[in-house]
Amino acid sequence: RKMFAQNAVEALWDISKPTIAMVDGFALGGGCEVACSCDIRIASDRSRFGTPEINLGLIPGYGATQRLVNLVGYGKTMEMVMTGEMINSADALKWGLVNHVVEAEQLYQFTIDIAKKIGAKSSHTLKVAKQTIRTALSIGLEEGVAIEAEAFANLFDSEDKEIGVSAFIGRHPAKWQHK
């Protein structure tokens, strides 16, 4: 039976819009799993990450054993889960667990800046991009490339593609219709 927290983390993973985790401090256990469920993870230089459940006779229960493998690889996932030790933000960046590490005082603004860059794009195209990239987690390369090609072809006929090309040629910001 799934618990409320598992459902919440899965719901976060399933959001069709881009998600960003902003971590300032400890992201241990469920906190690390929530961060792993986001598309982009930004951490302060004082952040720590870990899956300490092994110290309680448990394993991560909200998807970390699966999502960490995709982020940091098999060996680092095994190390994190089996030792239960924390890693600092510098190691999290080096391992691929986070996208960026910034000074704590700059974390909020840096995260907002990334969100604004993403938010300035076509929401329709972002949704298709997220779906297409996610397919790489569950299917082979050949099938994934075919799905990407189909998504590209579909977007090529979209209103937002016309708007984007026109904006690029005219050297002005795009006014997306999100279609």
Q: In which residue ranges do the predicted regions lie?
A:
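Extended, non-globular alpha-helical segments
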Residues: R1-A11
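Crotonase-fold acyl-CoA enzyme core
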Residues: E10-H124, D157-S158, I163-S166, G170-H172
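Short, charged, surface-exposed hinge/linker loops at domain edges
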Residues: I133-I139
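Short C-terminal tail/terminal secondary-structure segment
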Residues: L137, P173-K179
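Short beta-strand->loop
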Residues: G140-V145
